[in-house]
Amino acid sequence: MKIKKGYIRSQIKAQIMLAGYTMAEAVELLSTEYGWSDSLSNFSAQLRRESLRYKDVLELADVLGYEIVWQKGRDRE
């Protein structure tokens, strides 16, 4: 599966909104819970560059009340 540029950013922003938070509120939660920078511009830049680490995504999911679950998809040949 090829992922289009901007797809990950859009998905993360959508999940933040679906959880009932603004980007600024999500950044504040990450700062409080995990010691992230409280800079919204830094977080936005990471999303734009698609440079979030897997650990970062897990922490973001946690503060939003989500859990990342790997689900087996189609078999590859």
PLM ranges: what are they?
Residues 28, 32, 62:
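Alpha-helical residues within the helix-turn-helix
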Residues 31-52:
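Recognition helix of helix-turn-helix/homeodomain-like DNA-binding domains
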Residues 1-23, 29, 67:
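A short, Lys/Arg-rich alpha-helix, primarily the initiator
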